[in-house]
Curated annotation (Swiss-Prot):
Residues that hold (6S)-5,6,7,8-tetrahydrofolate according to the record: 109-112
Name the record gives this protein: Methionyl-tRNA formyltransferase
Classification via CDD domains: FMT_core_Met-tRNA-FMT_N, Met_tRNA_FMT_C
Record-stated family: Belongs to the Fmt family.
Lineage: Bacteria, Pseudomonadati, Pseudomonadota, Alphaproteobacteria, Sphingomonadales
Described function: Attaches a formyl group to the free amino group of methionyl-tRNA(fMet). The formyl group appears to play a dual role in the initiator identity of N-formylmethionyl-tRNA by promoting its recognition by IF2 and preventing the misappropriation of this tRNA by the elongation apparatus.
Keywords linked to the UniProt accession: Protein biosynthesis, Transferase
GO terms for cellular component: cytosol
Catalytic activity: L-methionyl-tRNA(fMet) + (6R)-10-formyltetrahydrofolate = N-formyl-L-methionyl-tRNA(fMet) + (6S)-5,6,7,8-tetrahydrofolate + H(+)
The protein's enzyme class: transferase
EC number(s) per entry: 2.1.2.9
Gene, per the UniProt record: fmt
Keyword Ubl conjugation: no
Domain of life: Bacteria
């Protein structure tokens, strides 16, 4: 099939690779424009742009697809289908209508649960035991289009980074399967029941509130690994918790109290025991390594964000 691929981050790269490996004709790759990054703020191409250039596929990164010129250029590609994976731009109706089979999206949840920008993180935060990938026909609504196929994946204590990588691989394989036999995957309208929305992650959500239950904080740590990173503050410094375990607590300590020399921290229900942490500007380390160079003794009271 003659395809335009539209994607930007690491999540999208496996789908691009899978389309090429399956023998499809990639007419163009659309991705977000290069962004300033690093200390020097040099313009850095996205993971999809880098991979497309390695593969020798023409790359386009319009700032918008709303203007008539961009839409005419897209229509002139004479596509069978456009495949979309975390592209990051709204597709107006002329773009959705241009390919013969429309635009198919790789979405990182089991729709209609977790429509929106952050389905992986929201599934972890909610304690969902399973999530997955949906191949859907795009329409103007936010992830509201009919579904062609789904595949489930257990969450199993994974971080957002680990789960995203797994969903990227399974979504790539599922998209290739769908394209190989479109008549065998008729679109099914999403049910009206069970709709939830995966709002974009606000950095303010990443500060740990020890007045939450230990299980919820453990999910917060996994949901925000690798970014933006769940953190607490001590002596004016942010300490990121990269991994922790939720443990029982039977003492009278207030939430936020460090209750032993292993950095076990009391929560409103239970306690958390960090296993991997990171100081600002430092490499990740074990909790023991942190404590050898940064005193947080038993009895220390760690602050939680003010409640509004």
């Amino acid at each position: 099939m003659r395809i335009a691929f539209m994607g930007t981050p690491d999540f999208a790269v496996p789908t691009l690779d899978a389309l090429v490996a399956a023998g499809h004709e990639l007419a163009a790759v659309y991705c977000q424009p290069p962004r300033p990054a690093g200390r020097g703020k040099a313009l850095m191409p996205s993971p999809v742009q880098r991979r497309a250039e390695e593969l020798g596929i023409p790359v386009r990164h319009p700032v918008t697809l709303r203007d008539a010129d961009a839409q005419a250029v897209f229509a002139a590609l004479a596509l069978d289908v456009a495949v979309v994976a975390a592209y990051g731009l709204i597709l107006p109706q002329p773009i959705l209508d241009a390919p013969r089979h429309g635009c198919l999206n790789v979405h990182g949840s089991l729709l209609p649960r977790w429509r929106g920008a952050a389905p992986v993180q929201r599934a972890i935060l909610a304690g969902d035991p399973t999530t997955g990938v949906t191949i859907m026909q795009m329409e103007r609504g936010l992830d509201t289009g009919p579904m062609l196929a789904t595949v489930e994946t257990p969450v199993d204590g994974k971080t957002a980074g680990e789960l995203t990588d797994e969903l990227a691989r399974s979504g790539a394989a599922l998209m290739v399967e769908v394209l190989a036999d479109l008549p065998a995957h008729p679109p099914v309208v999403q049910p009206e029941e069970g709709v939830t929305y995966a709002a974009k992650i606000d950095k303010a959500e990443s500060r740990i509130d020890f007045a939450e239950a230990a299980g919820q904080i453990e999910r917060q740590v996994r949901a925000f690994n690798p970014a933006p990173g769940a953190w607490f503050e001590h002596q004016g410094e942010r300490i990121r918790i990269l991994a922790c375990e939720a443990v029982d607590r039977h003492g009278p300590e207030a939430p936020g109290a460090v209750i032993d020399d292993a950095l076990t921290i009391a929560c409103i229900d239970g306690a958390i025991r960090p296993t991997r942490v990171q100081r600002a500007g430092k490499a990740a380390m074990s909790a023991g390594e942190l404590l050898r160079g940064f005193a947080i003794p038993a009895g220390t009271q760690l602050a939680s964000p003010p409640r509004t």
